Swiss-Prot record:
Component of the ERMES/MDM complex, which serves as a molecular tether to connect the endoplasmic reticulum (ER) and mitochondria. Components of this complex are involved in the control of mitochondrial shape and protein biogenesis, and function in nonvesicular lipid trafficking between the ER and mitochondria. MDM34 is required for the interaction of the ER-resident membrane protein MMM1 and the outer mitochondrial membrane-resident beta-barrel protein MDM10. Belongs to the MDM34 family. Coiled coil: none annotated. This is Mitochondrial distribution and morphology protein 34. Residues 274-283, 508-519, 572-586, 759-779, 923-943, 1045-1059 have a biased composition (Low complexity). GO terms for molecular function: lipid binding. Component of the ER-mitochondria encounter structure (ERMES) or MDM complex, composed of MMM1, MDM10, MDM12 and MDM34. Residues 252-263, 284-293 have a biased composition (Basic residues). The keyword Glycoprotein does not apply. Residues 204-305, 317-343, 390-427, 480-520, 556-600, 645-675, 716-817, 923-1097 are annotated as: Disordered. The gene is MDM34. It comes from the Eukaryota.
Length: 1097
């Protein structure tokens, strides 16, 4: 198809209008300084040569519309002449400010330039425009012509100007104008054509359209005028509340009056109830998000007036908002957001938004105004004024507090339900608490408490911020110093401050509520902290800060009633795993946890019972204890005990002294745990070895035994007095936990290193490695039983995971020790003392001194490497980690800094066991009580190679513990061997928490080493830094050192040398590898990481 287009000369009128449009367009916006005048169109000629159009496609053709795609080619004689004035500035800038007063140097040389700005007229002519474009042309009788260029149409244009004689300027102008023309064709011309066409083509249609539009506009204003109120009311819970809730307005007024008068919670409650009752308010939730409220109250004042007007006859116009529905409703930026629905109303009543309070506060507004005020309050400013102005805050605050309480306490945030009991309750509360409420409210205003993150799964249960009861329970277990209180409060408001996010507002102390509130309050504090993390996909995530490792993360309390449902996996794996992780003080629980470095089998002695929890909690200062403890410390109580002993040694020794001090405490704490628990340790450490270690129940028959052990340790006696701890053997035969602490003569267990003290031997694992490990190897890591039940050597200290040091102790999983160190509180001793005889502490001291011994020192170093290097990751943290693993929280390093998770590189996965042993487990395990595990794995390896020798050595070690200095090597060696020989590599449910990575490697190495050279000197050298490699020292938390493992594959990576130097190197590596963590991940860590990767996939 072809067409002939007529291209007649355009009329003067067209040229004039086009010139005017061009003028306005050219002069719109700021002009460059160079242009000193307006740009005027002097000539505009459309030319006589028409463009060539080639029809490529016709998409729509009708009497009143056309859509086609054309190829437009134009090479005509159209031209455009513009004139303006430009400012020619001096080409040379004077060097001196006084240049104007004196002849310039240039002038003196006879060169004259403008010394001042010069305004020069300028003409610019554009002609010879060549266009080649693909054009989409849409002609509509109603909408005019739309012309769009699908490519860059401008091929060339000729630009001539006044300054053509200056080549530079000419070239510059050419480039600039071409660029601007291209932009014009792309952006401006289509708009110009469209507007022109609307004037010409759609004259009639436009007039009709205008009429319609005017008509619509005429109708709209009333709707709109009314809309702000109604629309707002619909979108604004406040208005809705007003109309729906207080159709007559009187009820509300009466309410507000009542509130004014009595401010009684009842009136507030009544008010809240009233809104709830209103048909329209079914959705209203007491907790309307504050941000929503704010949005709603954007025009608070207008709202007030509108409200009053509307309120006067809310139903006069039936539902004007509906009848005069504005389709743009919700799109108008000035309107309140509609998404809140009516939830804001309930929230208003419930929240300390000052809404109801405002009603009371500002009698003038009455209900309407109060609603408006509430809206404003939602905005926040009005609320604050009102709150400050009136103690009305009390009412709304009460609601808010109640709201918070109900949400946190009930763990439910039913929007409709919010106004009910909890509202009333809150109101009642609030009446009493208005001061605290007010404060809370202000705080709330600052922080949008109204938003309950818990309903979004935030913070994660692992974050200990969740509102869920279960989470709260766990959190209370973890964080709660007052477990009972927490439990009392549906665990939701855990004293630990894990109470629901909403619990932020302090509520008056009321029996239930006060506990809840206190926990809430704690939470509040915790909640105040929000952190912004880069999201993996980009952007950022802002969420309440979740404290991990060194934070208040403590082992979630196991619901003793449902031990298996206590999230054992969280703790490490075996069902019994969780048992130990009770809320006992961090010490005990931690120790328990720690003992099983994996949370696997935490000591679950009698004291694991909830009632014990509180005791332990008090002992630990539960909130701090786990937090304070390093991972190892959490891992095992028994570890803790040795840790405490080692710690005592440590405390004696200078370098270890800090750790040691802490350690003694820790150990003592462990001991204390033992004794306080009557040393009923279901030590996970032991149990760690057996997956059902839970059953491992060290029945330390008496604190006396513990004391005796302590005494023994103090004495440094070799005596393996039965601490009266009989270890009920774990379910796994592996653990010869049945051997009483004092009892097992056969395995190295009975052999208690002198000074080991019953406490040391008290722990089976500890017995096996306990004395040795605790005194000499990583004190904290002594784990019970890595060896099979029958294998006394297995019971001997597990490979000296942490043989090396007090530091080990310090970082040992032993809750006390590690905790001390972490807590930085001088010692957990005091808490340790809670349960156990002071002697324990003394024992710890003795051990600490032993630790100080050279061998200890070496161990300490090793320990430190592993212990110090390890981040303080508590079992709790490990549990958290598991929680995170299982939760939808990404563990990606982008989301959470790894520095907080020692376990990050070596995820704590249950069942870490490699041929080399529980390498991964060992490090952490050893350090954590997983040491037991490491013992286990070592035991496995060692058992394979030199079980008997190991046992012997271990026994020797135990004896030598007393002589820590004297027989560190032997001890370590024995330790290592004992576990190795004692027990086939047993699947330890220990998690390698960063601290023990090196230890892990060592552990695995050690088992192998033990196999190959059970008595390897390096192991023996447990006392010596080098020997630590093989001794507990390797597990001691010495830095991730390359361990010399005889054959441990995991160890081999780090196995390079057992010398302290290696250990240190390993430590350094580990540190390097995970900065916040322990150091380069141990082999175990690596394995763990691989496993983690697999899990992720």
């Amino acid at each position: 198809m072809s067409f002939n287009f007529k291209w007649p000369t355009f009329s003067d009128e067209f040229h004039t209008s086009a010139a005017q449009m061009l003028n306005s367009a050219l002069n719109r916006g700021p002009k460059p300084k160079v242009i000193a005048d307006d740009i005027l169109v002097e000539e505009l000629g459309m030319g006589t040569i028409p463009p060539e159009l080639e029809i490529l496609e016709i998409g729509d053709l009708g009497t009143d519309r056309f859509r086609g795609i054309f190829r437009l080619t134009y090479a005509g004689d159209a031209h455009l002449v513009l004139k303006t004035k430009v400012q020619a500035n001096p080409l040379s800038k004077p060097n001196r400010p006084d240049i104007g007063l004196f002849p310039s140097s240039n002038a003196s040389r006879g060169i004259l330039f403008a010394a001042a700005p010069l305004i020069v007229p300028m003409h610019l002519r554009l002609s010879s425009v060549k266009l080649r474009a693909i054009v989409v042309l849409v002609v509509s009788k109603a909408k005019g012509i739309t012309l769009v260029f699908k490519n860059d149409p401008l091929e060339s244009v000729e630009v001539s100007s006044t300054f053509d004689s200056v080549a530079v300027i000419q070239k510059y102008l050419q480039q600039e104008i071409e660029g601007q023309l291209r932009e014009m064709f792309r952006e401006d011309l289509p708009g110009i054509i469209h507007r022109l066409s609307q004037k010409w083509l759609s004259g009639e249609a436009k007039s009709e359209k205008d009429k319609v539009k005017q008509k619509a506009e005429a109708e709209e204003p009333p709707a709109r005028s009314r809309e702000p109120t109604l629309t707002r009311s619909t979108s604004e819970p406040l208005v809705a509340l007003e109309t729906a809730s207080a159709p007559g307005g009187t009820p509300r007024k009466s309410h507000s009056k009542a509130k004014k008068h009595s401010r009684s919670g009842a009136s507030v409650a009544d008010f809240a109830a009233s809104p709830c009752q209103s048909p329209q308010r079914p959705r209203q939730s007491p907790r309307r998000p504050r941000h929503v409220a704010k949005a709603a109250s954007t025009s608070a004042v207008p709202l007030h007036s509108e409200f009053s007007a509307t309120h006067a006859s809310p139903f006069d116009a039936a539902f004007p908002d509906i009848e005069n529905y504005d389709p743009t409703y919700g799109l108008r930026p000035d309107d309140l957001p509609t998404h809140s629905g009516f939830s804001g109303l309930g929230r208003l009543a419930q929240r300390g938004l000052g809404g109801l309070k405002d009603l009371t506060a500002s009698p003038v507004f009455d209900l309407d105004t109060a609603l408006g005020a509430a809206d404003v309050d939602l905005d926040g400013a009005a609320v604050f004024e009102d709150l400050n102005r009136q103690s009305d805050d009390e009412g709304s605050e009460a609601e808010q507090s109640q709201d918070a309480h109900s949400s946190s306490h009930d763990g439910k945030h039913d929007e409709g339900d919010a106004t009910t009991d909890s509202d009333l309750d809150a109101v009642l509360h609030d009446v009493g608490d208005d001061v605290s409420d007010l404060d809370v409210q202000e705080r709330d205003n600052l922080v949008d408490t109204s938003i309950d993150y818990s309903r979004f799964g935030y913070p994660p249960a692992s974050a200990a911020f969740s509102d869920a009861h279960e989470l709260t329970r766990a959190s209370s277990i973890i964080f709660d110093d007052q477990p009972q209180l927490t439990r009392k409060h549906s665990k939701r408001g855990s004293v630990s401050g894990r109470s629901s996010t909403r619990a932020r507002r302090p509520s008056s102390s009321r029996s239930d509520r006060s506990a809840c509130t206190s926990s809430l309050r704690k939470r509040e504090e915790a909640e105040v902290v929000y952190e912004t993390i880069p999201a993996v996909g980009g952007g950022i995530v802002t969420r309440p800060r979740v404290y991990h490792i060194a934070s208040k993360v403590q082992p979630p309390e196991v619901d003793w009633d449902d031990e298996d449902t206590a999230r054992p996996s969280q703790y490490g794996g075996t069902p019994s795993t969780r048992t130990g992780t009770t809320r006992f003080g961090s010490d005990y629980g931690s120790a328990t946890m720690g003992a099983q470095s994996s949370r696997t089998n935490t000591v679950r002695g009698i004291h694991d019972l909830p009632h014990l929890n509180s005791a332990f909690v008090s002992r630990d200062g539960s909130e701090e204890s786990l937090i304070d403890l390093p991972p190892e410390s959490y891992h095992s109580s028994d570890a803790s005990l040795p840790h405490a002993l080692d710690a005592e040694r440590s405390s004696v020794s200078g370098s270890d002294s800090r750790r040691g001090l802490t350690n003694p405490t820790s150990r003592e704490s462990s001991y204390r745990d033992l004794s306080s628990q009557d040393l009923h340790w279901d030590h996970s450490a032991s149990s760690t070895a057996p997956s059902s270690s839970q059953s491992l129940h060290w029945d330390m028959h008496s604190r006396n035994d513990a004391a005796a052990r302590t005494v023994n340790v103090k004495a440094g006696q070799n005596a393996e007095s039965n601490s009266g701890l009989s270890f009920r053997k774990n379910k796994s035969a592996n653990h010869q936990r049945s051997i009483t602490l004092g009892g097992g003569g056969g395995g190295g267990f009975p052999l208690r290193r002198p000074g080991e003290g019953p406490g040391m031997s008290a722990t089976p694992a500890r017995t096996r490695a306990s004395a040795a490990a605790s005194a000499r190897s990583r004190p904290g890591f002594i784990t019970y039983a890595t060896s099979p039940p029958g294998d006394s050597s297995g019971w001997q200290r597990s490979p000296p995971l942490r043989a090396s040091s007090d530091r080990d102790v310090a970082f040992s999983t032993s809750p006390g020790v590690a905790q001390d160190m972490l807590s930085i509180s001088p010692f957990r001793d005091s808490s340790l003392h809670h349960g156990s005889p002071r002697e324990t502490s003394n024992v710890a001291g003795a051990y600490a001194s032993a630790s100080n011994s050279p061998y200890t020192s070496g161990h300490n170093k090793g320990t430190q490497g592993a212990g110090a290097a390890p981040t303080h990751l508590s079992i709790d943290a490990s549990a958290h980690f598991l929680d995170l693993v299982k939760s939808n929280h990404t563990l990606s390093p982008f989301t959470r800094s790894m520095e907080h998770f020692t376990v990050r590189s070596a995820p704590v996965t249950p069942g870490w066991q490699t041929a080399s042993g529980n390498v991964s487990v060992v490090g952490s395990s050893a350090a954590s009580g997983t040491g037991t595990t490491s013992g286990s794995s070592q035991t496995g390896a060692n058992a394979k190679s030199g079980k008997a020798g190991s046992d012997k050595t271990r026994s020797q070690d135990h004896l030598s513990v007393g002589h820590t200095v004297a027989e560190p090597k032997t001890h370590c060696q024995a330790d290592s061997a004992a576990p190795s020989s004692g027990l086939p590599a047993r699947r330890r449910r220990t998690f390698q928490l960063g601290g023990s990575s090196s230890r892990d490697d060592t552990a695995s190495n050690k088992p192998n080493n033990t196999s190959t050279g059970q008595g390897e000197d390096s192991q023996d050298n447990s006392a010596a830094p080098g020997s630590d490699d093989y001794g507990f020292a390797r597990y001691a938390g010495s830095g991730p050192q390359p361990f010399r493992a005889s054959g441990s594959s995991a160890s081999s990576a780090i196995t390079d040398s057992s010398s302290k130097g290696n250990r240190l190197g390993s430590k350094d590596l580990r540190r390097r590898s995970r900065p916040g963590s322990m150091g380069p991940p141990s082999e175990a860590a690596r394995l763990s990481a691989l496993r983690w990767e697999a899990i992720r996939e």
